[in-house]
Amino acid sequence: IDYFYYDYDKLREENIDPIVFFFGGQYPILDYQVHCSIDKDLCTQYRTMNGAPDFKQGADKDAVVLDVREKNIDKTMPDYAYNPLAQTPYTMLFINADVVLEYIPKSMKTKGLQANPDAKVIQEDAWTLWDVTTSKWTFYKMFNKVIDEAKKISDPTERANYVYNFAMLNTLVHNNPYFSYRNFGSVFAFLLDKLKVPYSRLLVTNRMTEPIGQLANIWNVTDGFMLSNGQCYFPLSTRYVTTANTIPSIYQNRDAVATDAKKKFQKGPFRNVTVPGSQAKDNTEKVDIDATIDGILLNIKRQDATTGCDKEGNIMDYTSAEQMAQAWGADYGVTKFAQLYDKGLNVADQRAAERAEQDKKSIADNFSDEIKGYHDRAAVKVNDTKVLSCGEKDKPFTYLVDYQMDGLVKKAGRNLVVSVGQLVGQQVHIEGAERQRNVDIIYPYPRTYSVTVRLTIPDGYTVSPESLQKLNSNVDLSLIHISEPTRLLSI
């Protein structure tokens, strides 16, 4: 049983964070009850999602009263490949006052209760917010040079990509979005206008929030842009954005609202669109392993190459700022990381040296964690790690790790047993009741995963072909497509 109590004095300076009630959990729920008593002088909005039961509405003196009760909730939330915001009934509750220190949209200025308000009204608030934050922008010397170079490019999409990828370069090397999330709509529109690139404005929500057609809160909206060829641009992110030509996975196939209007765009006209998605061939991870048995140890050299959305969140973890600056900066005349500091030469060189020391430790730690994550156990020894390709433009992000593992080779009499399954990637552990599933499996995007293992065995040993069949027999081919079953290539 959870109790929440908020003092009205808090609402004079800031609003209460949104409250979410999920009608489901990790285990079946016998009895779930929600009771709310909210001052009538506040604006109370709620939205029920995915078939969540509605509140019974009432009043008590100066308060709005909301009650809901559900018994015997048998539906549970699996841990694997499940999106609660798309698959579990839940209700979002927003309580707002007209506080001075925050921007309060028009729809939230009406006192009292608004049950499941029209999403278009909240969309109008989001367009208005975009409009009031629109302004002219100035940039530092190097960025202005990039803009001037972009103007020389004949293709409008490539002009936009050139500027966006430079901003992405700065985002990666500084580990911080070059344009803030809230300013992106204003600053990138300013840049596209400056570059004379035609565009549509988009309002969209990501897959971790409600659909735009059921919008409940303007702060869940993302400002974006779509060109006539379907190319889209969204706020820079250290977690999801890779390059201009790859739409972040959290926005793919999401419904959006668009307008082509340039002046007074907040008034429309609007149209419904869908952000383009990707295919499995666009998002690939290719793993090549050379493994050698050394007694009961396994010496492994593993190369991992990713494309598309599979690059998300990986580049910064394993690549030094210096290497990223040189690879991503080649098109912009950047030859070293220090050039990306808007400081004097001495200060820039000093900061670059400090960053190099930080990278040396953090990258080593990240690679150690990567090896542990891949095999579900730590390496005995890490011999070498290196990034071969930094993933700039549409190139793969590729790295090589050389290490030694124990526990993957065991002696059984005169035989050696190799845990080949732990060479093909991290194992998914699905236990107990979750092994029987009656809800959809939701992956963030389609992908292709391929592993090639070359195992060098000691002299005098041969491989039993029958043992490889176990890698196929444990897979239900009606659920997962295997383009090429495991086979013995050579001994």
Regions found by a protein language model. Name each.
Residues 28, 137-140, 154-161, 178-186, ...:
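Conserved structured core elements
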Residues 192, 302, 455:
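Hydrophobic, well-ordered secondary-structure elements that form the walls
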Residues 171-175, 193-209, 445, 461-467:
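Short, well-structured beta-strand/strand-turn elements
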Residues 166, 183-269:
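Hydrophobic/aromatic-rich core segments of domains that either
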Residues 280-297:
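Leucine-rich, highly hydrophobic segment in Treponema pallidum outer-membrane-associated proteins
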Residues 267-279:
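Short, Gly/Pro- and small/polar-rich lid/capping loops
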Residues 318, 328-479, 483, 487:
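A carboxyl-terminal module marker
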Residues 8-18, 22-171, 293-347, 408, ...:
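Secretory-pathway-linked proteins and extracytosolic
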